[in-house]
Amino acid sequence: MKKNRLNLNGVVVINKAKDISSNKVLQQLKYLFNAQKAGHTGTLDPMATGVLPICFGRATKIAQYLLDADKEYIATIRLGIETDSGDAEGEIIAKSINIPELSAEYLEIVLAKFSGDVVQIPPMYSALKYNGQPLYKLAREGKTVEVKSRNIKIYELELLEFNIDSLKIRVKCSKGTYIRSLAIDIGKTLGCGGHLIALQRTQSGPFKLSEAFRLEQLKDLSFEQKIASITNIESVFIDKPIYSLLEEEKNDLYKRGLFADKPHLDGTVRIYDVEKFVAIAEFDKGKLINKKFFDQDILISE
């Protein structure tokens, strides 16, 4: 007989290990916590490691906010070899011995071309769909289709180290950025090709690697310690401004929706009733256009 599953609410930040899929991490965590409902916030490739927030219960309603959040990565690029997938798991499709002589000054000039607003073409080996079919399935069948480019933003691109045939970079970027595509494009710009050989996500939205748990750590915890590892829903929005409801605004917010003119507010805000976080709201030029209600104090609900 199966144990009754717990209706947990909140987020557990996982430090994903290499060679495990994001979905397998999700299923293992759901089993470890005996959770009724869980979902992740965007996949990491099996070869990638690092920050993978897992949402439980009511927190799954705000998973999209983490999907849309900025990310930070540490990436290592191998030069002189191209693969069909753009990473070390793919088949080699080209080799070059014409790797230029690298220097910090030269690489900084090259990397500067990829900072700011960038137009990027996602790789064929991705979960994006073409006529309803995931691109990676078409790629595995040997098919190639024209993939639409997308506008992304790279806020920070820092050279960490390099040697004669590789470089390591730190990338802070917007949603929708493919680090494999960045590795491919950097290799092309250097004139020798390249592919991604290591990737670690160090931050996803407000969640940093330093606060993430390895699955092995969680397996050794008591039930109480596991529950303590769940961070509340407000933590997802900890960098967002707070709007405290006035007494006369409460009925409008809870019943009809608050449409008051708030010219100083734009984007996502945290709504407080007295001293308690009760909702998130989207303001567009001071007008409330969307809201979601929470009771962040309830980690385990009926």
Curated annotation (Swiss-Prot):
Responsible for synthesis of pseudouridine from uracil-55 in the psi GC loop of transfer RNAs. HAMAP family: TruB_bact (MF_01080). Pfam families: TruB_C_2 (PF16198), TruB_N (PF01509). It catalyses: uridine(55) in tRNA = pseudouridine(55) in tRNA. The keyword Isomerase applies. The active site is at 45 (nucleophile). Keywords: Isomerase, tRNA processing. Its EC number is 5.4.99.25. GO terms for biological process: mRNA pseudouridine synthesis; tRNA pseudouridine synthesis. GO terms for molecular function: RNA binding; tRNA pseudouridine(55) synthase activity. The gene is truB. The keyword Disulfide bond does not apply. It comes from Francisella tularensis subsp. holarctica (strain LVS). Belongs to the pseudouridine synthase TruB family. Type 1 subfamily. This is tRNA pseudouridine synthase B. InterPro entries: PsdUridine_synth_cat_dom_sf, PsdUridine_synth_N, tRNA_psdUridine_synth_TruB, TruB_C.
